[in-house]
């Protein structure tokens, strides 16, 4: 009765309870005695006998960083447990080393003033954006009640004052509105699914950072969408040297969400490694630079990049890489990142959720690549060529992965190589007039992507670029290749398409022959690379100098969420701490 009374009183004292120092000292003595006994066995050439599996490890083998794995240990050396939720286990600890355990509780980091700083900054920015959008944007006149068309189910006798020309105007407005609803809304819906679900689930590859990935994916889309509406209007008026209010329709929405996907590509290089305040700085900076690059290349130079091989994939990958090399330039940070290998921060469940996101991206890639097409025939070619390219990349990814792994498949090769064909064809999908060429491009891209994932990713890791989501290999390299292939198809158009049709359809009434256009396309590639890399370096330095926040451990949901969602990640040298008796929220 006395023992149970003591345990109950101990639980009622507060949320946390801990083992006494006497018990810790007893554990230390038991382990020292066990080590002496093992040394005697070794001297007698007998196999050592261990009291538990964890004791098979030497102290040097099981050391792990405290911030990475065991933030539940306080400076006094006492190990804390949430009372009433986990069974207390015996621990030996010198600050970072657990020797006897099958369960660990993770204590949430203390609240930081920077958490409140993020909320206040975000509120101020939202108020500013709402004010700007309300002031600078107007309804499209086709959707305004003043210009709405006559309902066909009502008698025309009620409109005796209308002339035939008025009825024709109303009828044309009705047809344009109907086309926008049937065409552009479907594209807008597909791009939203690809952005929210595709990229969101793709970024759940890290098991301890899945909640952060989905949350910041949603936040970045919503926040960057508003920023892109504003900056697109500013740069469009600047390059046209005139001012007019923005129009709210599906076309402007598609361009805004298109740029948001560029930001999602960049976040693959820094997700789980930066604070939420740094996220805001990076979203604002990249929204400005991506809008500048898009309007410069599209409005001023009239570059053909229908699916965004330059605007989205190349720009996003290079920008994310440049920000990474600045923020993690120090050797200490890069050595810390080496502990987070793909084998230790992923598991079967996180890989399964990642492949769900990739399946969504494969399904909606044709809509994404055709979203900026200028005409229906271009949109038709974009859909067909994109699907053919994805088929080719999937087939070649399976084949090459089997060759490199003795007939077996590597999940990473299949994951990221499968949709790389949609990236390489994205820039030239509207000017590729041979469907077999799209299939061939997809197969070549799948082969290169798998080979680079097998060998080049190791080289990146040795140089300190810890690219979990492979943004350079999957988005950067195929995007650059696709951008250089586009001028080849454009240069060949003089043999395949009449010049008049080419001028009207492909260049939006701009008189320019195909060879001049091919040269400008190459110039646009270097402009995009320069803006992305120099801008990423500059933004990285500004983010670092401003000290916008610091996180205690990488790939950790507990950094930003009030409840511990993630499982404890340990080094490969440590015994697996998962147990069948663990509660479901700990597993």
What spans do the regions from the language model cover?
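Intrinsically disordered, low-complexity cytosolic terminal tails
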Residues: 1-102, 573-587
């Amino acid at each position: 009765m006395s023992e149970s009374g003591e345990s109950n009183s101990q639980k009622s004292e507060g949320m946390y309870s801990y083992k006494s120092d006497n018990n810790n000292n007893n554990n230390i003595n038991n382990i020292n005695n066990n080590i002496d006994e093992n040394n005697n066995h070794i001297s007698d050439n007998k196999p050592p006998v261990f009291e538990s599996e964890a004791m098979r490890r030497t102290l040097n083998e099981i050391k792990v960083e405290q911030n990475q794995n065991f933030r539940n240990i306080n400076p006094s050396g006492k190990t804390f447990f949430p009372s009433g939720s986990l069974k207390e286990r015996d621990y030996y600890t010198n600050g970072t080393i657990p020797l006897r355990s099958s369960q660990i509780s993770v204590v949430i980091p203390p609240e930081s003033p920077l958490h409140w700083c993020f909320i206040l900054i975000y509120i101020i920015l939202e108020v500013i954006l709402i004010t700007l959008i309300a002031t600078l944007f107007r309804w499209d006149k086709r959707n305004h009640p003043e210009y709405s068309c006559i309902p066909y189910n009502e008698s025309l006798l009620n409109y005796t004052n209308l002339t035939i020309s008025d009825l024709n105007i109303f009828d044309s407005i009705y047809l344009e509105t109907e086309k926008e609803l049937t065409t552009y809304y479907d594209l807008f819906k597909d791009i939203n699914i690809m952005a929210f679900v595709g990229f969101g689930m793709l970024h759940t590859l890290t098991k301890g950072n899945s909640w952060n990935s989905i949350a910041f994916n949603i936040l970045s889309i919503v926040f960057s969408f508003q920023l892109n509406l504003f900056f697109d209007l500013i740069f469009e008026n600047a390059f046209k040297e005139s001012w007019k209010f923005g129009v709210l329709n599906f076309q402007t929405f598609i361009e805004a969400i298109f740029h948001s996907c560029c930001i999602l590509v960049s976040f693959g290089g820094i997700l789980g490694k930066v604070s939420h305040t740094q996220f805001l700085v990076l979203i604002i900076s990249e929204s400005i630079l991506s809008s500048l690059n898009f309007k410069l290349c599209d409005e001023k130079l009239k570059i053909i990049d229908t699916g965004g091989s330059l605007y989205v994939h190349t720009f996003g990958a290079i920008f994310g890489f440049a920000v990474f090399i600045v923020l993690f330039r120090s050797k200490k940070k890069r050595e810390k990142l080496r502990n987070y290998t793909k084998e230790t921060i992923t598991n079967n469940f996180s890989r399964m959720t990642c492949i769900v996101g990739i399946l969504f991206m494969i399904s909606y890639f044709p809509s994404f690549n055709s979203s900026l097409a200028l005409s229906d025939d271009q949109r038709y070619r974009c859909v067909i060529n994109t699907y053919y390219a994805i088929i080719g990349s999937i087939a070649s990814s399976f084949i090459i992965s089997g060759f490199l792994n003795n007939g077996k498949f590597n999940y990473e090769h299949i994951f990221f190589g499968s949709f790389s064909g949609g990236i390489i064809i994205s820039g030239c999908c509207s000017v590729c007039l041979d469907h077999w060429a799209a299939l061939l491009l997809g197969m070549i891209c799948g082969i290169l992507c798998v080979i680079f994932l097998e060998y080049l990713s190791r080289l990146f890791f040795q140089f300190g670029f810890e690219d979990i989501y492979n943004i350079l290999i999957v988005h950067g390299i195929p995007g650059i290749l696709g951008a250089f292939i586009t001028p080849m198809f454009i240069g060949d158009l003089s043999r395949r398409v009449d010049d008049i049709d080419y001028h009207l359809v492909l260049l939006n009434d701009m008189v320019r022959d195909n060879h001049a256009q091919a040269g400008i396309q190459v110039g646009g590639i270097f402009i995009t690379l320069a803006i992305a890399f120099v801008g990423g370096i500059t933004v990285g330095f500004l983010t670092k100098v401003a000290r916008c926040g610091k996180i205690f451990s990488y790939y950790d949901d507990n950094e930003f969420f009030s409840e511990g969602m993630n499982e404890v990640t340990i080094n490969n040298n440590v015994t697996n701490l998962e147990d069948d008796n663990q509660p479901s929220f700990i597993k």
